[in-house]
């Protein structure tokens, strides 16, 4: 069970650019997840944003009015009982940032697919994001029909029918569709009830060896800090199994690239956990759920500017091997989604360059051999992954990487 300061479940906020993912996240959590200056300037999410909220229930009101994220009941002002804390992962909706969305999907226990009622459905990245959730095995999905305040009742019903038609035969075929206005905060109680009903906290085995997907890494020191005040590098990510404690030794793989003569190999990094935290709250032990900040003894130079994002961290000696080459069983989609002309997807070819997402890592690989049921791929950047893990596969089509399917590591 996650500590009380910690979220129990990670929910992805996905969908086409400008359909209101970040606005909805803000309404639910009070946090505007576009915090990087470039994001504020361009009005789009570039990196994964994270924000937590507590779902609460009024002890006297009926459903769904009893659900809120506020400090008191929205209907009667009465006392609230906290049901659980959840963490939202706000993924970029822009087509050029698909790799970031795919790396975020590996952290998601469920997802909210945001679709604007004011535009035709499906838009290109609505399709691509739904396929990505399917490819990476995210099955617990709620559809939010946002911006209903901008359309007439007839247009909202027509858009609802388009959503039903679009999701037919997909992983979201039976997903609830909740009409919402994130701008006005309308129907959020119904959405909170749906989150409680349709995205349960997964069963977690806390006795297994811990694994942490690293999604971000930072140097938290300000320029000009005194040497005595310097802090070690910080990594941020989600624990996917087991538990980490302050004082534990931590191994981070693939680690550092070392060149000796004309040979290059990767050396895992070993460090110690100095602190664990969620936002500004400190933890002694961290469990799966939410984004965890892990303070280490590492040289901050190793962690600055997300240098370790895409790594896997755990107790030394328990992590899978680092792969510079991988064999996968490909499962390709029939057509390319996300582009205007939905081309038929050809089988993988020998010497083809592919983009692969494994866990939170993004790498490029060249197929050494390719058959319909098996492909061997040499990776430009190695990844630390287990047999049986899913790999999202993207192919360069025109000037963009497009998701074409997934593979299982053999």
Curated annotation (Swiss-Prot):
Region of interest: G3: 90-93
Record-annotated membrane-spanning stretches: none
Positions of Mg(2+) 2 binding: 18, 43
Region (G5) location: 181-183
One GO MF term: tRNA binding
A GO cellular-component term linked to this record: cytosol
Keywords of this entry: GTP-binding, Hydrolase, Initiation factor, Magnesium, Metal-binding, Nucleotide-binding, Protein biosynthesis, Zinc
Residue intervals of the tr-type G domain: 6-203
Broad enzyme group: hydrolase
Region annotated G1, chain positions: 15-22
Residues noted as binding GTP in the record, renumbered to the chain: 18-23, 146-149, 181-183
Known EC number: 3.6.5.3
Gene Ontology biological process terms in this record: formation of translation preinitiation complex
Region (G4): 146-149
Residues bound to Zn(2+): 58, 61, 73, 76
Chain sites annotated for binding Mg(2+) 1: 22, 45
Pfam family, one: eIF2_C
Cofactor(s) needed for function: Mg(2+)
Region (G2): 43-47
Superkingdom per UniProt: Archaea
Reaction it catalyzes: GTP + H2O = GDP + phosphate + H(+)
Family assignment from sequence similarity: Belongs to the TRAFAC class translation factor GTPase superfamily. Classic translation factor GTPase family. EIF2G subfamily.
Subunit text: Heterotrimer composed of an alpha, a beta and a gamma chain.
Record's function text: eIF-2 functions in the early steps of protein synthesis by forming a ternary complex with GTP and initiator tRNA.
Protein name: Translation initiation factor 2 subunit gamma
Organism: Methanococcus maripaludis (strain DSM 14266 / JCM 13030 / NBRC 101832 / S2 / LL)
């Amino acid at each position: 069970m996650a500590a009380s300061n910690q979220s129990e479940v990670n929910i992805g906020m996905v969908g086409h650019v400008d359909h209101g993912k970040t606005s909805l996240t803000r309404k639910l959590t009070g946090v505007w997840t576009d915090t990087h200056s470039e994001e504020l300037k361009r009005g789009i999410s570039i990196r994964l944003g994270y924000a937590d909220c507590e779902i609460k229930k009024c002890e006297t009101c009926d459903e769904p009015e009893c659900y809120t994220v506020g400090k008191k009941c929205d209907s009667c002002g009465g006392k609230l009982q906290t049901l659980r804390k959840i963490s939202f992962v706000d993924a970029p909706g822009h087509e050029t940032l698909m790799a970031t969305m795919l790396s975020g999907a590996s952290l998601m226990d469920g997802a909210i697919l945001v679709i604007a009622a004011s535009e035709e459905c499906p838009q290109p990245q609505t399709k691509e994001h739904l396929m990505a959730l399917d490819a990476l095995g995210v099955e617990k999905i709620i559809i939010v029909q946002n911006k209903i305040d901008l359309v007439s009742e007839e247009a909202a019903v027509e858009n609802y029918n388009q959503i039903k038609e679009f999701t037919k035969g997909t992983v979201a075929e039976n997903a609830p569709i909740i009409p919402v206005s994130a701008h006005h905060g309308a129907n959020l109680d119904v959405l909170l009830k749906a989150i409680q009903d349709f995205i349960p906290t997964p069963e977690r085995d806390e006795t297994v060896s811990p694994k942490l997907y690293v999604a971000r890494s930072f140097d938290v020191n300000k320029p000009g800090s005194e040497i005595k005040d310097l802090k070690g590098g910080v990594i941020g990510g989600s624990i996917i199994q087991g538990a980490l404690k302050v004082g534990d030794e931590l191994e981070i793989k693939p680690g550092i690239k070392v060149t000796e003569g004309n040979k290059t190999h990767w050396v895992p990094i070993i460090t110690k956990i100095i602190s664990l935290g969620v936002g500004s709250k400190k933890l002694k032990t961290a469990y799966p759920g939410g984004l965890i900040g892990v303070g280490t003894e590492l040289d901050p130079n190793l962690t600055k500017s997300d240098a370790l994002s895409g790594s896997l961290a755990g107790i030394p000696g328990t992590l899978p091997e680092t792969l510079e080459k991988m064999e996968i069983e490909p499962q390709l989609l029939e057509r390319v989604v996300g582009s205007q002309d939905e081309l038929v997807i050809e089988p993988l070819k020998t010497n083809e360059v592919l983009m692969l997402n494994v866990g939170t890592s993004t790498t490029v690989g060249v197929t050494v051999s390719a058959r319909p049921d098996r492909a061997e791929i040499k990776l430009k950047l190695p990844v630390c992954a287990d047999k049986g893990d899913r790999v999202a596969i993207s192919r360069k089509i025109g000037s963009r990487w497009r998701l074409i399917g997934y593979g299982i590591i053999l």
